[in-house]
Regions:
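A structural signal for short, well-ordered beta-strand segments and their strand-loop junctions
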Residues: 50-58, 122-123, 131
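Short secondary-structure junctions
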Residues: 45-54, 108-114
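Generic low-complexity segments that are intrinsically disordered, proline-rich and/or Lys/Arg-biased
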Residues: 4-9, 24, 64-67, 71, ...
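Active-site nucleotide-donor binding segment shared across nucleotidyl transfer reactions
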Residues: 53-74
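Active-site acidic/histidine clusters and adjacent loop/turn architecture
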Residues: 1-52
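Catalytic cores and adjacent binding grooves of peptidoglycan-active enzymes
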Residues: 71-166
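Generic hydrophobic secondary-structure signal
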Residues: 3, 34, 38, 55-57, ...
Length: 166
């Protein structure tokens, strides 16, 4: 359970609970794989840019989401949405993540995220949506995590789209 805002989410990670918790809402549980996946993303882009690249969590638990919205953020443990902390790099990083998702079979980034147990990786417009679920997943025999979904959701030219990369 996330309760103390300034404590690390997990030992060895540079995330505090404040990045996942909104004081206006109640405490919630978080899948351990999600901060590990975010750390894998931070590490990947820090190595690539050869400087510290921050990832900001923009959304987690939203219990007041309308019922017609997907339950990923409404029901704990919730999904997390995130963006690059550096506004100037957001489009570039999401574009790079999109490229990694499209070539997921050979992607070090995707492999490192899947190793954490995170099995839902979706680009949603301008953010990255990460989650763990047990249904509506594709089966990929031979992978460390065989059941996962990698894709992209969004709106383009006023029309919604959903692309599955895996």
């Amino acid at each position: 359970k996330i309760q103390k805002k300034q404590e690390p989410v997990m030992v060895g990670l540079n995330f505090t609970h404040a990045e996942f918790w909104n004081p206006a809402k109640c405490d919630f549980e978080l899948y351990q794989c999600l901060p590990l996946a975010l750390q894998a993303i931070r590490d990947f882009f820090t190595k690539e840019y050869q400087r510290e690249i921050g990832i900001t969590v923009t959304s987690t638990y939203r219990p007041n989401d309308p019922i017609n919205f997907p339950a990923a953020h409404r029901i704990p443990p919730p999904a997390v949405d995130s963006v690059a902390s550096d506004v100037n790099l957001r489009n570039e990083i999401i574009s790079r993540i999109r490229s990694e998702f499209k070539r997921w079979e050979k992607s070090e980034l995707v492999r490192n995220i899947l190793k954490t147990g995170t099995n839902v990786l979706i680009i949603e417009n301008t953010c990255l949506h990460l989650h763990f679920r047990k249904e509506n997943l594709s089966f990929h025999p031979g992978y460390e995590c065989e059941h996962f979904y990698i894709g992209e959701w969004g709106v383009k030219d006023g029309k919604q789209f959903n692309i599955a990369y895996s």
